[in-house]
């Protein structure tokens, strides 16, 4: 079994926050792949289903962000999972809005949800870093992540979530490159090819110059007029 965790804060008040993009990601996977209903378990809510050959449990911790590791640790102990079975979807200030990066292991970079997970299960798990951009000053970070996405963000956000759902099966089987390609196709769809075999219209030929019938003396005189 694989455990996909989306980080966020519970309740309608936080539903549209930038900090909740992890919740949004696993919700998109559940919806696109016909997962079962969400039910309360492991200090959060879970939904079960299959992605290709893999049985996958989706988890949204409801401990609030800073205690996410309690929920994740409980689920992993129940199913006897290792960090290699865990992938966490979370917001990333250090990536531009709409950018996505995969990471295996490493530090938490100050993210309180990851910090809590580190404390409960170690750091050797996978992450899907979902770019939300940075407000420009560290003092503005808290209010920035706890505010909703702007209307101008909705286009790329919807494309990103669709791409995550498209590539979820590849991610579950460990094919990170194919997962990222699925997201890229949603974010930057290929340009339509020009029809082959159509010849470009020929440029119109310049009209031939009329023959110069002036005498040499006339041409010389015209130069000084």
Swiss-Prot record:
<feature type="region of interest" description="Disordered">
    <location>
        <begin position="187"/>
        <end position="225"/>
    </location>
</feature>
<dbReference type="Pfam" id="PF01195">
    <property type="entry name" value="Pept_tRNA_hydro"/>
</dbReference>
<feature type="site" description="Discriminates between blocked and unblocked aminoacyl-tRNA">
    <location>
        <position position="9"/>
    </location>
</feature>
<dbReference type="GO" id="GO:0005737">
    <property type="term" value="C:cytoplasm"/>
</dbReference>
<dbReference type="InterPro" id="IPR001328">
    <property type="entry name" value="Pept_tRNA_hydro"/>
</dbReference>
<feature type="binding site">
    <location>
        <position position="66"/>
    </location>
    <ligand>
        <name>tRNA</name>
    </ligand>
</feature>
<keyword id="KW-0963">Cytoplasm</keyword>
<dbReference type="GO" id="GO:0006515">
    <property type="term" value="P:protein quality control for misfolded or incompletely synthesized proteins"/>
</dbReference>
<comment type="subunit">
    <text>Monomer.</text>
</comment>
<protein>
    <recommendedName>
        <fullName>Peptidyl-tRNA hydrolase</fullName>
        <ecNumber>3.1.1.29</ecNumber>
    </recommendedName>
</protein>
<keyword id="KW-0820">tRNA-binding</keyword>
<feature type="binding site">
    <location>
        <position position="112"/>
    </location>
    <ligand>
        <name>tRNA</name>
    </ligand>
</feature>
<comment type="similarity">
    <text>Belongs to the PTH family.</text>
</comment>
<feature type="compositionally biased region" description="Low complexity">
    <location>
        <begin position="200"/>
        <end position="210"/>
    </location>
</feature>
<keyword id="KW-0378">Hydrolase</keyword>
<comment type="function">
    <text>Hydrolyzes ribosome-free peptidyl-tRNAs (with 1 or more amino acids incorporated), which drop off the ribosome during protein synthesis, or as a result of ribosome stalling.</text>
</comment>
<comment type="function">
    <text>Catalyzes the release of premature peptidyl moieties from peptidyl-tRNA molecules trapped in stalled 50S ribosomal subunits, and thus maintains levels of free tRNAs and 50S ribosomes.</text>
</comment>
<dbReference type="InterPro" id="IPR018171">
    <property type="entry name" value="Pept_tRNA_hydro_CS"/>
</dbReference>
<feature type="binding site">
    <location>
        <position position="14"/>
    </location>
    <ligand>
        <name>tRNA</name>
    </ligand>
</feature>
<feature type="binding site">
    <location>
        <position position="64"/>
    </location>
    <ligand>
        <name>tRNA</name>
    </ligand>
</feature>
<feature type="active site" description="Proton acceptor">
    <location>
        <position position="19"/>
    </location>
</feature>
<dbReference type="InterPro" id="IPR036416">
    <property type="entry name" value="Pept_tRNA_hydro_sf"/>
</dbReference>
<feature type="site" description="Stabilizes the basic form of H active site to accept a proton">
    <location>
        <position position="91"/>
    </location>
</feature>
<dbReference type="GO" id="GO:0004045">
    <property type="term" value="F:peptidyl-tRNA hydrolase activity"/>
</dbReference>
<dbReference type="GO" id="GO:0072344">
    <property type="term" value="P:rescue of stalled ribosome"/>
</dbReference>
<keyword id="KW-0694">RNA-binding</keyword>
<dbReference type="GO" id="GO:0000049">
    <property type="term" value="F:tRNA binding"/>
</dbReference>
């Amino acid at each position: 079994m694989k455990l996909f965790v989306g980080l966020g804060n519970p309740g309608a008040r936080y539903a549209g926050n930038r900090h909740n993009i992890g919740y949004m990601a696993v919700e998109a996977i559940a919806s696109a792949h016909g997962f079962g209903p969400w039910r309360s378990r492991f200090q959060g809510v879970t939904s079960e289903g299959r992605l290709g050959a893999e049985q996958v449990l989706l988890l949204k911790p409801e401990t609030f962000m800073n205690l996410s590791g309690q929920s994740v640790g409980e689920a992993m102990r129940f199913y006897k999972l290792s960090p290699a079975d865990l992938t966490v979807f979370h917001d990333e200030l250090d990536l531009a809005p709409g950018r996505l990066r995969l990471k295996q292991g490493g530090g938490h970079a100050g993210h309180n949800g990851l910090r809590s997970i580190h404390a409960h299960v170690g750091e050797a798990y996978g992450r899907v870093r979902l770019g939300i951009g940075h407000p420009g000053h560290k003092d503005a970070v808290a209010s920035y992540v706890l505010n909703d996405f702007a209307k101008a963000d909705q286009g790329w956000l919807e494309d990103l979530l669709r791409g995550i759902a498209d590539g979820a099966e590849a991610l579950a089987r460990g094919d990170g490159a194919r997962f990222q390609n699925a997201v890229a196709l949603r974010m930057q769809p290929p340009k339509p090819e020009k029809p082959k075999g159509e010849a470009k219209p020929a440029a119109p030929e310049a009209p031939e110059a009329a023959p110069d019938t002036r005498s040499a003396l006339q041409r010389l005189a015209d130069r000084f007029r």
